[in-house]
């Protein structure tokens, strides 16, 4: 009988131990559950929104700091990851979609702002989402994209057999982002002078082309949220405008933040840092972040709203300079909160358009008050 009692005692201990373990969440599963929940929640509306984060390796941390003005005005403030790894693009998205948007060329008048200021003609390329022509008076959010060194207008739509355009088509088709207009622009005049120094001079001057010519030409032609192409109406519609770029296009994106925060709310700098002060090999990181912070504070951007999705590949040739700025910005959490700044990396990503495609795939659902969809929630074709 004693042996039977011993056996029963051992079994009882095993059962109790199993129940205790079952009651404790697995840390990895808990992190995944927390992040997935963040992806499924809607962002808050207006200037006090906190965009939902893409899936990251770590769970959201509790915010113990004093709430910002945007947080105190919001009914619900999400706790989201501020850093992590981006999610790979669904493999089939690089192939043509059933419902495909169209790309059209638009020629507009400008000036050679990096040169003698002479009048010139430039061409940009515009992606119109599927159904644009039949959508009546529907207005669309708009994203401007800038290429890197040696790049050209339209390259985002044509590189890799149109893989980036295909991703846009699929994301819109499956309800992961709202239909939007996308512009693939250039800081070059005609592409004849593409040495590095001239390229940097051109991107530094691009904001004048953007403000005075490109933006009015595009938004005076296509139906965006700007009531007209007037400067006042373009400023009034900043909540519906985004700007992103890769490599020197990332540098351009930071310049756009510095000059054109009155016109643009969402920013996507990919593989690059701010060169408002300094330049390549002279990365004045603290001085540039100090300046960005002063723009935020002096222009009430915390209340008005802005969001930066900063990204780089883990094997990118410009990772060091990008990380320097990210670390400096993340070290100022009272200014650059997760509602305003996030930094994500592509695992194994190098300096190419595959990384760009992944960053767009991760960032765009966070722009323009887009509702987040999981793959299961996306409408079927």
Residue ranges and their predicted role:
Residues 17-20:
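C-terminal motif of bacterial Sec signal peptides marking the signal peptidase cleavage site
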Residues 22-50:
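Short, low-complexity, disordered segments immediately C-terminal to signal peptides
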Residues 1-10:
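Positively charged n-region of N-terminal signal peptides that target proteins for export
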Residues 36-40, 46, 55, 61-381:
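Non-catalytic cap/lid and distal C-terminal segments of serine-dependent acyl enzymes
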């Amino acid at each position: 009988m004693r042996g039977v009692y011993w056996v029963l005692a051992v079994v009882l201990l095993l059962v109790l131990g199993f129940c205790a373990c079952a009651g404790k969440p697995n840390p990895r599963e808990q992190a995944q559950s927390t992040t997935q929940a963040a992806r499924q929640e809607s962002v808050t509306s207006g200037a006090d929104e906190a965009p939902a984060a893409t899936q990251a390796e770590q769970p959201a941390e509790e915010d113990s700091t004093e709430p910002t003005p945007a947080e105190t005005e919001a009914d619900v403030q999400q706790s989201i990851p501020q850093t992590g790894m981006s999610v790979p693009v669904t493999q089939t998205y690089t192939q043509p979609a059933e419902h495909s948007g169209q790309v059209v060329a638009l020629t507009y008048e400008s000036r050679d702002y990096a040169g003698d200021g002479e009048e010139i003609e430039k061409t940009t390329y515009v992606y119109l989402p599927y159904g644009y022509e039949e959508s009546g008076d529907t207005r669309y959010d708009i994203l401007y994209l800038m290429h890197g060194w040696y790049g050209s207008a339209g390259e985002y739509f044509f590189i890799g057999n149109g893989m980036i355009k295909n991703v846009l088509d699929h994301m819109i088709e499956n309800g992961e982002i709202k239909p939007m207009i996308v512009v693939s622009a250039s800081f070059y005049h005609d592409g004849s002078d593409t040495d590095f120094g001239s390229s940097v001079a051109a991107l530094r001057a691009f904001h004048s082309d953007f403000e005075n010519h490109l933006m009015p030409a595009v938004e005076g032609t296509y139906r965006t949220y700007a009531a007209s192409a007037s400067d006042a109406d373009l400023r009034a519609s900043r909540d519906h405008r985004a700007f992103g770029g890769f490599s020197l296009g990332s540098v351009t994106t930071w310049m756009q933040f510095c000059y054109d925060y009155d016109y643009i709310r969402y920013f996507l700098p990919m593989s690059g840092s701010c060169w408002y002060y300094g330049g390549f090999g002279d990365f004045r990181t603290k001085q540039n972040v100090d300046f960005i912070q002063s723009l935020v504070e002096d222009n009430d951007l915390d209340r008005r709203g802005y969001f930066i999705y900063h990204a780089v590949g883990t094997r990118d040739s410009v990772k060091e300079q990008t990380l320097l700025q990210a670390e400096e910005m993340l070290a100022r959490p009272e200014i650059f909160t997760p509602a305003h700044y996030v930094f994500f990396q592509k695992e194994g990503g190098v300096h190419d358009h595959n990384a760009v495609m992944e960053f767009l795939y991760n960032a765009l659902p966070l722009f323009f008050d887009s509702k987040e969809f999981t793959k299961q929630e996306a409408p079927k074709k």
